[in-house]
Amino acid sequence: MRKGIIAGTLAACCVLFLAPLANAEPSGPLKWKQFSRTISDVHPVFTTHSGKHVGLMWLDPSVLAFRLIPGTTAPEKSPVRGIDNRPSTWVPKLVAAFNSGFLLKDNPGGYYYNDRVVKSMVDGMATMVLTKAGGFDVIVWHKDDRISDDVLAIRQNWEPLVVHGEDQSNANDSWYRWGGTDGNSPLANRSAVGVTADGAIVYAVCAKCVAHDLGIALVKAHVKTAMILDMNKSWPNGFYYSAPKKHGKQPVGHRVADGQWRTPGEYLYRGTKDIIVADAKAPTPAPEPAPAQ
């Protein structure tokens, strides 16, 4: 069942959120590895590789809450909430984290955060939507879409990479087709994120690849809609984290793929660019027993 999330103050709309998974696992031709960490007996993270270049991380939103943390310099002119400056609000329950999009000046798309439109949304752009309750979706923005009160962040970044389960890229695309590369090279470090038909979030990252490599991998992961994220040498980075062994200690991070420039510890703090973090949801309390008859 799909649930509308965008409406409200600006008009009626058609942007929809998928219901969270019910303890599902990845499907498709790829061989996924189950991460040992569990939340309420559910494995929230699976990883795999596609081809020589692309690392993939599959995330279960039924036990994870997603949040955008604005960077100190990007997105440019972003509002900042007090909790965004406090890693203690996301690090203790951190399960996974990954990079967000381009600088706004390098990106035709829009940006919304904490009740403020920083840059207007653009029709047809690939769009991340995050709710105040921790929901996450990737959609294609339509001109009649409007923002409801339960939405915290909307981040557009380029045209969609995958639409209706079909890769929109081509192996022969120009070096600038999916964003400008260092040295105008067709090969670059790249990243992307998408959602499957049942609501799983799949992050993809690669070193020295073309966008088509990401598109092919995400389609193999049964992603229905996907968008390009940040690119070039140091920006594409995705991690998953083991729970701290002792109270007060930091979680231990693991790279999604080889060739990532940054270390897992860098997402334990607010950096210069925005990131997406996935925290473990609080366990659902057991129902009260029915009174004796």
Where do the protein language model's features map onto the residues?
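Positively charged n-region of N-terminal signal peptides that target proteins for export
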Residues: M1-G4
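Bacterial N-terminal signal peptides
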Residues: G8-A19
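Short Pro/Gly-enriched beta-strand edge/turn motifs at strand-loop
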Residues: R37-V42, P108-Y112, A171-G179, A257-G259
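Active-site-adjacent helix-turn-beta-strand microarchitecture at beta-sheet edges
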Residues: F98-Q168
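Histidine/lysine/aspartate-rich catalytic loop segments that bind and position anionic ligands
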Residues: R155-N184, R190
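Zymogen propeptides
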Residues: A22-S120
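Extracytoplasmic/secreted cell-surface and envelope-processing proteins
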Residues: D106-G109, V138-I139, I147, A171, ...
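Extended C-terminal subregions enriched in glycine
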Residues: V163-H164, D182-P287
